[in-house]
């Protein structure tokens, strides 16, 4: 049986001044380990919390399984959020993307929000060199706090990806 090693990275965007970047790693890939890493950050999720993930392509088994992330999502009282992809595949169109979300079991355990299902918003980029704004799903404005869960992956579009 082919073993697939997933590297989980829990990212939390916190604005700090003159702070050293800390990286938290675990050898244990489990629901409890995810909660321990999150708690080590020392930052409590407040308000309307979303948990950004990649729900994976329909035929691809490499994504963060709902049962792996369930304890953390429940602990922060989060809503799973995802966006459609810019490349052709099972998540490029809204209906197909919802089919993948269902097939992979996310909607059976969590509230799920496809952030760019209906609209998008532009967020200005400060001190821009190449981009004046970033386009994100319009539903992002509905949340106060985001926890981002990533798994390491390579993309045929030209590089490594995240959530």
Which residue stretches match the model-derived regions?
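N-terminal and secondary-structure boundary signal
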Residues: 4-8, 18-163
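Compositionally biased, low-complexity intrinsically disordered regions
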Residues: 10-12
